[in-house]
């Protein structure tokens, strides 16, 4: 419903309330450990595709290596899908079975 305002000259102006924009849903991109993909390759993709500094990339790679899975980053759906596709293409070219998945972030109540 629009608010109505009348000025001194009798002109009526209607102002529509601003629509609240919803934040897009975010997704975690998960890296899964395997016995064949090298640690160096995982660090490379974390650095080049996910734009992490070397220390952060190494920390995440070690977490994935030790725990089986780890979060590479949190993105909107389209960005997450694009990053997964890019990494999987790079892995295939190097004949690595590196697997990535994505899952929705928990929404704030």
Which residues does each PLM region occupy?
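Terminal domain-initiation and capping elements
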Residues: 1-109
